[in-house]
């Protein structure tokens, strides 16, 4: 027998006098120990009735344990005799490579990845091995097949008495047997392993010290089965890889699909060359720790320092306080557990104390091959016991009982004299190794708790592991990326917090008021919280959907979408492992609170009585635990030295939870929102300095979480984002899960992806690949940085083909959109690795692929992030970028109409979901209220609210788009219909029409105009067969337009053909609208003003709406001082580069642009007046407006531009450069007289607005010059659009028109409502406009001097715009 059994025997013999029954305990099977543990498990439970267990020193056992710890062996016979072996024998592992699971994989990755290639309509038939019994109870232990090498950094764990399932308390001693005032009745649950099963090595692999020693780790392997009564979790097993259709699969944290095939095995080679092991795959006794960081050395290569155990100071009688022993140099911190506050469960080794009894298991102590609480098999449960949300710090000592009024009994505080050497030297040694904080005081306790509700933790910051804290030595999840001694730089983990799903099946403890801890609670005497039966009881999986409904109303569980692309953050970093110093009360308890009173809400006075009367969940008495109680008693008198959040024991493990601190600052309580960790007390703050707060806020809404709820039920309940809200597999949710499985299988089979309407969309919508992180609820990108010049690669790309050499417009959709997503931060989840540039090969004409390309790409149904890229990547003409997500490699060649028809999904459905963002309902808080412009600003804001596109109108347009799209796709799936214009650029008004760009295959041998007329005629015939539209008018201009009206809502629709520049400039306006809140009110007010004065109609040779928007943006860039808007072309030249021939480009119409930090604080009224002033004095004869350069350009330069569509005859009166094709967007303003009258309206409006400061002076009360419309004549439309003079509008049909008069060629009539003298002044104008005030103008507002308007009060407008 092992020394552990000898220790148990000694302890049992010492307790025999006081007990009526003794229990023979043999070693239990530990699933994380040697793989030879193969035999069945016999669990026996006996009741030991004791009145008191005397304290007996077991000092004769301490040298044996220490000797075994240093021996490097865990063989039972050697442990029995105390034979030590050299330390060299434990260095038997491969450093960076995790061996594959025993037995290998039954199915290769190629097979798993290729399952969906031809499985449409074929049921899945992947056999489940005998080691997996889904949703059933396994009665036998799994067969272990293969040994796996040990890790190099595994220390040798000292033995412990049999029956001790967990290592001793921090500060515990091997030579003490402690138990005092134990509960009258305790239950001992033991397991016996068959001889030769390898179970002997398990108990010896667990440290028996108070602070876990650097013991030899158990051999790593993946357990192949489940223990009795354990929840069935499907993992990678020794015999094969199984389909992960169970959402109780929270342990592979970087695997892409929520259902489906895992993307990579457990032991895989990371691109960085480091091994990645996730916590929970390997259940192993954690290694010893090297207190001194070794810079530049990975933890698997770092030597393990063997140090003696911590000797603890005995508690004084039954008092509730203890003194802090002086620190000694002989007791350095040693840890054999990576649990944050000790091994969880009914009793931890660190906190091994008698516990109040409850036959049911806590929700984190469920018996599985991880946990096996009752039978002591797996070094303790994988999850900790329930904890209280408000725990921010922990006293050095385990809570036994807390008395009310100063009278209480101490359950277990006894210790022996040899254990008084250095009670808290572990704490002090750990604290002295940190620069943050030493021993904390009670005030620090209170302060760190209060920090949970808002402020940052000024004392220290910490991070925790995501899924589990049973970390392996080589687990990159245990990286301490905050350690100052670290020499490696690690990017934050790129996936959000993942909740433990089964947690919802357990009720939360009642929120109790936190009280200041006034007593010292020994850390070693851990007693788990005793809850009521209804509170502790675990709900059955098939109990029904209402089993947990009452406990899940306060929050939502976070979604579990994790992709292998997030693996980029998993790299090794030199630094310490988790060292949990003494000072942590049991998980779920607040300092100074009784576990009973904390769990049941009982007053502290009743805590001791309740604890004494309750029956223990498992063996925690000294007689039952043997040396375990001795270990626990070693730290009984640990002082009130609360370990800092940044001490050795609380170093950051993972940046999965760094969102929480920032979210606390944003008003989201991390303990109550979805960011609370279910692996640690909810109150603990995390560091968020490395994550994008806005992105996290977008991807993790927690609006339903009550900020005052101390129990943080948010993580118990499903979230809206999660695709299975009935997550606990009740009878109702099983059907939902099965339906989701079917959808996922169909998605794999059809080469598409189930529609997720919460993500953004593209215009065109053929490729949504790079938006996958948004579809997966991860932080969105705002596309600021590129890793290669966009236009340079496209120059080479287009030089290989004729000007119209694209075989299909689908080829332009092939381009991976991520090369147009320019990262603001390299650490963003979907950041492109440097070197992963996209190289476009020469596209060859492949007639046989035209239909496939068009079907896959032209159809907006391919709006998923996979449906287009994978089939196009299979073609030989494009090299797709590398992606970590291997599911994109599936051979997806199925026609996407199948997927569209299956779901009935169109791109308009995505835009329908953003209808709530269309309207601005409230003025921003920054709007000034105390200056002279306040009435005018409010009038401008009111005008904007009245004229902006409402949510109702927006939805009408989206549904109309969907109807047109559906009609077209049923007959011509190669067509692409994309909504452009002000309807989706946030500049739309109530009366705005709809502009649709139709994309289709082009033939280079056919004239583009004739081809456009043909396709528009086809569309007219298709739509004419329905009864939805009327008044069709096909305008065969140079840019043909099909115009018609909706019968129901009378919405005017314009469809153009292959006008790709409309897609780009729509996206540009959409981006500008997000940079400053004043842009949209200014633009809409100017548009309303222009429409009121009849100068906003390109058909009438006036300014189009798009040109007006460019004028507003140009003014905000140049005319306002300081500028309100930047020049996006200068900031992001690759993103907004010139449009290349036949290059439609990719834009994200849901792109999030950060607001521009402008120093301009002018109000809306001030900006409107400045706008009118700026364009009243603008020198239109010399300069052209250009938002591309952020200034003005000489007209000669614009005429000389070599753009393919540029025409020197277009640059006449009003010159506004199109930022993408360098044409003149205001080419409709070619008549000199008309333009002069337009300028007069600018001048007159400015003078009236400046004199009255009333917006109605330029609207309802305006009586100056204007342009009146005559009824349309019967002249031919061809004469209008195909005029003989070269200055006639060549692309008139493509201009955006808000006019209610669809008929062409109206007559122009100028009317002077005041006097005719103004026209004489205009005709005889000098270099700068000189205006004679009319009779109704206020004489005090006349311009003086030479008549120039330069002398006006507004000094914010530049006299001359800058020349680019």
From Swiss-Prot:
Biased amino acid composition, Basic and acidic residues: 66-91
Keyword terms: ATP-binding, Cytoplasm, Magnesium, Manganese, Metal-binding, mRNA processing, Nucleotide-binding, Nucleus, RNA-binding, Transferase
Tissue: Expressed in the brain.
Ligand binding (Mg(2+)): 993, 995
Catalytic activity: RNA(n) + ATP = RNA(n)-3'-adenine ribonucleotide + diphosphate
Database matches in InterPro entries: MTPAP-like_central (IPR054708), NT_sf (IPR043519), PAP_assoc (IPR002058)
Intracellular or extracellular location(s): Cytoplasm; Nucleus
Domain PAP-associated: start-end pairs: 1163-1224
Biased composition regions of type Low complexity, renumbered to the chain: 27-51, 175-198, 417-426, 461-493
Listed GO biological process terms: long-term memory; mRNA 3'-end processing; RNA 3'-end processing
Enzyme class: transferase
One term under GO cellular component: cytoplasm
Record field: compositional bias (Basic residues): 445-455, 494-504
Signal peptide location: none
Stated family: Belongs to the DNA polymerase type-B-like family. GLD2 subfamily.
Subunit structure and binding partners: Interacts with Fmr1 and eIF-4E.
Main function: Cytoplasmic poly(A) RNA polymerase that adds successive AMP monomers to the 3'-end of specific RNAs, forming a poly(A) tail. In contrast to the canonical nuclear poly(A) RNA polymerase, it only adds poly(A) to selected cytoplasmic mRNAs. Required for formation of long term memory.
Protein name listed in UniProt: Poly(A) RNA polymerase gld-2 homolog A
Organism lineage: Eukaryota, Metazoa, Ecdysozoa, Arthropoda, Hexapoda
